[in-house]
């Protein structure tokens, strides 16, 4: 499945760069993080925290990104009187994806003391996390604001928001220092053409993404800080 998403992009980039580009699949976060932080990858597509980290540590340059921003909210049930602010979640259960999921990282960024953090009840899927929180399996959850708007659309709100993280740029493709600077613009332009849109269509549809737009280093500056407590990124 992943090869189907990436192979058309690999073929296009091989043509643009003039060298064979190969797709390297990693089946888990640990091996991906280890290889990525060691600088094994020259072209990477992933989230803003990783892009920010690579800009700072590996001299990567983001070239195109998905257009919509990420906004995450930490929510609890509207009638939960024991939790009034996000800090009250220290030591309590939170239904969330396993870190380094971006939503989970934004929530954890509000807890500086490693000994005073929420307990993550690993839950896959935003809707599942939301439902588990309403069912009382955890005190709170973190979801994209669009997901909250969809699920809590009634006049009588079922939830209250404890924290809203600042908007962040979406997933991006970055290129590393082994790719000549004069090729960066060429690659970006190729990905934005009609041929590029065709090549990236399967990948973008997997993320409900519209057409790529140009990306800049400034947009992702400082985003790597979200990974400060994650293995391999310290």
What is the role of each PLM region?
Residues 1-15, 49, 71-131, 135, ...:
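Bilobed "Venus flytrap"/periplasmic-binding protein-like clamshell domains
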Residues 1-49:
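Extracytoplasmic small-molecule ligand-binding "clamshell" domains
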Residues 23-34, 119-131, 167-169:
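Short helix-initiation/N-cap motifs at beta->coil->alpha
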Residues 5-9, 28, 32, 40, ...:
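Stable alpha-helical elements in mature extracytoplasmic
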Residues 45-57, 108, 132-159, 167:
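A ligand-binding cleft/hinge motif common to bilobed small-molecule-binding domains
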Residues 25-29, 39-52, 66, 100, ...:
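Beta->alpha turn/N-cap motifs
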Residues 57-67, 162:
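A structural signal for short loop-to-beta-strand junctions that line the ligand-binding cleft
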Residues 68-76, 154-195, 201-230:
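Periplasmic-binding protein-like
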């Amino acid at each position: 499945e992943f090869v189907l998403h990436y192979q058309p992009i690999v073929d296009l980039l091989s043509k643009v760069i003039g060298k064979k580009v190969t797709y390297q699949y990693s089946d888990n976060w640990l091996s991906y993080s280890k290889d990525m932080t060691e600088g094994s990858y020259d072209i990477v597509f992933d989230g803003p925290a990783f892009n920010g980290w690579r800009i700072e540590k590996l001299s990567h340059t983001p070239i195109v990104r998905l257009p919509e921003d990420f906004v995450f909210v930490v929510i609890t049930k509207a009638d939960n009187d024991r939790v009034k602010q996000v800090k009250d979640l220290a030591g309590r259960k939170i239904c969330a994806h396993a870190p380094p999921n971006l939503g989970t990282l934004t929530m954890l960024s509000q807890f500086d003391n490693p000994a005073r953090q929420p307990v993550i009840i690993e839950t896959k899927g935003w809707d599942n996390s939301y439902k588990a929180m309403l069912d009382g399996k955890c005190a709170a959850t973190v979801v994209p604001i669009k997901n909250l708007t969809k699920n809590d659309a009634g006049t009588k709100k079922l939830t209250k928001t404890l924290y809203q993280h600042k908007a962040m740029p979406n997933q991006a493709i970055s290129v590393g220092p082994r790719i000549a600077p004069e090729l960066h613009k060429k690659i970006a332009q190729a990905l934005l053409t009609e041929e590029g849109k065709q090549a990236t269509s399967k990948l973008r549809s997997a993320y409900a993404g519209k057409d790529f737009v140009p990306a800049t280093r400034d947009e992702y500056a400082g985003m790597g800080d979200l990974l400060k407590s994650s293995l391999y990124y310290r």
